[in-house]
Amino acid sequence: KNDSVSAIVITSSLPIFSGGADISEFSGGDLSPMLPEVLDKIENTSKPVIAVLPGPAFGGGLEVALACHHRVTFADNKVGLPEVNLGILPGAGGTQRLPRLADAQTALTMIVTGKPTSVLKLPGVFDKISDKPEHLLEDTKAYLASLSGPNAVKRTCDITLSMSEETQGVFEAVTAQTKKASKGFFAPLKCIEAVRGAYTLSFEDGLKNEGKLFMECM
């Protein structure tokens, strides 16, 4: 612990936060520490962790942001979880954390289609949205100064979801639509199954289910 540090900011010096994993590393040797382990450490840090997105965040990059306690970006930015286009699903908690911050329809659409989404459509995901990227630093400092008490550390994993009748209807509609559109491509249906776990399982069991389904796609 360093008492001189009051908060941690995760950002990028480039005009992109992160494009996600380098899939060429999957066939390599030791990959430790694995991203889910890193994100668990981030999420359970006792000091506020803020993801500041100066540009797009995709795949594992967005999963990093979702594991942080707060997220700041700018209005024209886009984020996404495109893993389905590789025949897999988000494997570092994306199927569990995104539904806890966005509504079921939004989370399912993002994960099942893999399409980029405007941050303006994700008010529950981002705590502060600057009007321009050049205002990010100033706005982040102001946001940091506003953090205090129990709101300083907001762990996404602590949010509890339940499968309401309305949410069940969303799952049924998305599943029916996906079965028609996927034409035997099974990754989108695995994505739905993983997201369902966010509503029917504990966070820990949901992560295990996500990992199992991820391996079934490999």
Which role does the model predict for each range below?
Residues 95-105:
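Hydrophobic, secondary-structure "cap" segments at the distal end of domains
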